[in-house]
């Protein structure tokens, strides 16, 4: 039997990113974690609400991703729940992201954290901030799609 629990399930999602930004391009990145962090992630103690990605000295870093330590897992280590974590990307991907971030109005945000085999992966995206009227229009479009589905569902009964 496999030693690791294999689950394709998403660990955490950053729903606010889809509301606040227009997603342009997605990337899959590995993440450097300590043992207690992996145990906390397995327990689902992750929050990505105000997380963002910065590129410093040619390396991608995940900021403000809160991984709450388990009381039983981090007894001998001082656990920093909101520590900055290094993301693992190819040089081409980092250069591409860095080139777009330097343009005005573009940023890089994490969208989700998930298991891929025994490893934790982070889905990050190049994004552009939405204006207030864009957010309103997106909400109207979602409401109309929901209403349209209801109408079709009633018509097919």
UniProtKB/Swiss-Prot annotation:
Residues 135-157 have a biased composition (Basic and acidic residues). GO terms for cellular component: cytosol. GO terms for molecular function: RNA binding. PROSITE patterns: SSRP. Its main location: cytoplasm. Required for rescue of stalled ribosomes mediated by trans-translation. Binds to transfer-messenger RNA (tmRNA), required for stable association of tmRNA with ribosomes. tmRNA and SmpB together mimic tRNA shape, replacing the anticodon stem-loop with SmpB. tmRNA is encoded by the ssrA gene; the 2 termini fold to resemble tRNA(Ala) and it encodes a 'tag peptide', a short internal open reading frame. During trans-translation Ala-aminoacylated tmRNA acts like a tRNA, entering the A-site of stalled ribosomes, displacing the stalled mRNA. It holds the Pfam family SmpB. GO terms for biological process: trans-translation. InterPro entries: SmpB (IPR023620), SsrA-bd_prot (IPR000037), SsrA-bd_prot_CS (IPR020081). PANTHER family: SSRA-BINDING PROTEIN (PTHR30308:SF2), TMRNA-BINDING COMPONENT OF TRANS-TRANSLATION TAGGING COMPLEX (PTHR30308). This is SsrA-binding protein. It is found in: Cytoplasm. Residues 133-157 are annotated as: Disordered. Transmembrane segments: none annotated. Belongs to the SmpB family. It comes from Francisella philomiragia subsp. philomiragia (strain ATCC 25017 / CCUG 19701 / FSC 153 / O#319-036). Keywords: Cytoplasm, RNA-binding.
């Amino acid at each position: 039997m496999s030693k690791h629990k294999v689950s394709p399930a998403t660990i955490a999602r950053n729903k606010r990113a889809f509301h606040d930004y227009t997603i342009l391009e997605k990337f899959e990145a590995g993440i450097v974690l300590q043992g207690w962090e992996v145990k906390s992630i397995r327990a689902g103690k992750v929050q990505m609400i105000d997380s963002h990605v910065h590129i410093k000295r040619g390396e991608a870093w995940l900021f403000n991703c809160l991984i709450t330590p388990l009381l039983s897992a981090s007894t001998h280590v001082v656990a920093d729940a909101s520590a900055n974590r290094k993301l693992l990307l190819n040089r081409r991907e980092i250069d591409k992201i860095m080139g777009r971030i330097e343009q005005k109005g573009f940023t890089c945000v994490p969208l989700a954290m998930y298991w891929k085999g025994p490893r934790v992966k982070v889905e990050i995206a190049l994004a552009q901030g939405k204006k207030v009227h864009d957010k309103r229009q997106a909400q109207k479009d979602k409401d109309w799609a929901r209403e349209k589905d209801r109408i079709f569902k009633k018509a097919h009964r």
